[in-house]
A protein has these predicted regions:
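Preference for intrinsically disordered or flexible, low-complexity segments
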Residues: 2-183
Length: 183
């Protein structure tokens, strides 16, 4: 797969971004801080969330993948045993394990720059195992290539989820309806 091109790093969410998020996940955002990556279609596909939700609940997932097309494709990888295979490789390959630990440290550093969550792990199983490819891919998209080796690897396995168009209808692009359509 050709990976999505890098986009302007971390942008403030617009009203249209918040609406896209609501359409993507079927709920309003919680703890939304920024758009961490945009899909080639222009919609947000990774958001940066606060380390604590508005009610104070710790939320260790800094980068949250929002695109339902990407989420579905990653779910297929998970169902096909990719996480188990990656975890086995971590145990057998010290260089991969060291690079994955560095990805974990990067994730924690970025989260702690916002607010330190003591005694909370990073996400996705880092640094010792692979528990959630969604988190690893979100980290790779937000941080860029070369930071999370297993996120980069999973991203390379994905089809071009954006190729057939946006996962949601951008605000203002809804198809026009006539009075006949309303009957």
């Amino acid at each position: 797969m050709d990976t999505p091109p890098p986009t302007t790093p971390r942008t403030e969410p617009t009203d249209a971004d918040v609406e896209a998020f609501k359409q993507q996940l079927g709920r309003p955002p919680r703890g939304l801080r920024a758009i961490a990556h945009r899909c080639p279609c222009g919609q947000p596909d990774v958001v940066e969330t606060a380390p604590r939700l508005p009610d104070g609940t710790p939320f260790p997932t800094l980068y949250y993948l929002t695109c339902p097309k990407a989420n579905s494709a990653i779910g297929t990888l998970e169902a096909n045993g990719v996480m188990k295979e990656m975890t086995e490789r971590l145990a057998a390959d010290p260089e991969l394990a060291a690079a994955y630990r560095a990805a974990h440290e990067d994730y924690i550093r970025r989260r702690d720059e916002i607010e330190e969550l003591r005694n909370f792990p990073s996400a996705g199983g880092m640094p010792d195992r692979v528990k959630c490819l969604h988190v690893l891919v979100a980290h790779s998209l937000a941080a860029g290539p070369g930071v999370n080796p297993l996120g980069d690897e999973a991203l390379a396995m994905l089809p071009q989820w954006w190729r057939k168009g946006p996962c949601v209808t951008p605000p203002g692009d809804e198809p026009a309806t006539s009075k006949e359509d309303d009957r």
